[in-house]
Regions:
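Hot-dog-fold acyl-thioester-processing enzymes
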Residues: 1-56, 60, 118-119
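HotDog/MaoC-like acyl-thioester-processing domains
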Residues: 2-5, 71-119
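Mid-chain, well-packed structural core segment of small domains
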Residues: 52-84
Length: 119
């Protein structure tokens, strides 16, 4: 791992995804926008599967939502390493989610524990 390293994923959420989330979470959601927890799940996916990857422990996530994400529109979530603390096995990352036109939907940061920080 190194500072500046990043990964991205792009996906859209459908009305069916929204219905399943609403049923699972027993949540009231607007019918035409992606719920914020689903956007947060994109960051969780990237951190746990790609960077740092398997064995990562999620310690903290801060998200600031700047705009709503419409259904059926591609969203690109990105996590980028901003700081490495190998002595504590900690990795700080910037997180962003954008629409295809570049509109910033969400920005924030994450802190994870990763045993192979110094590798």
């Amino acid at each position: 791992m190194k500072i500046g390293q990043f990964v991205e994923t792009t996906r859209s959420f459908s009305a069916q995804d929204l219905a399943e989330f609403t049923a699972l979470a027993a949540a009231q959601t607007p019918g035409n926008t992606v719920p914020e927890p689903l956007i947060g799940a994109l960051f969780s996916y990237l951190l746990g599967v790609h960077l740092p990857g398997f064995g990562t422990n999620y310690l903290k996530q801060e998200m600031r939502f700047l705009s709503q994400a419409p259904l059926d529109q591609p969203l690109t979530a990105r996590v980028e390493i901003t700081r490495l603390r190998p002595e504590k096995h900690l990795v700080d990352l910037a997180t962003t989610c954008r629409l295809a036109d570049g509109t910033l939907i969400c920005e924030g940061r994450a802190l994870v524990l990763a045993r192979d920080v110094g590798a």
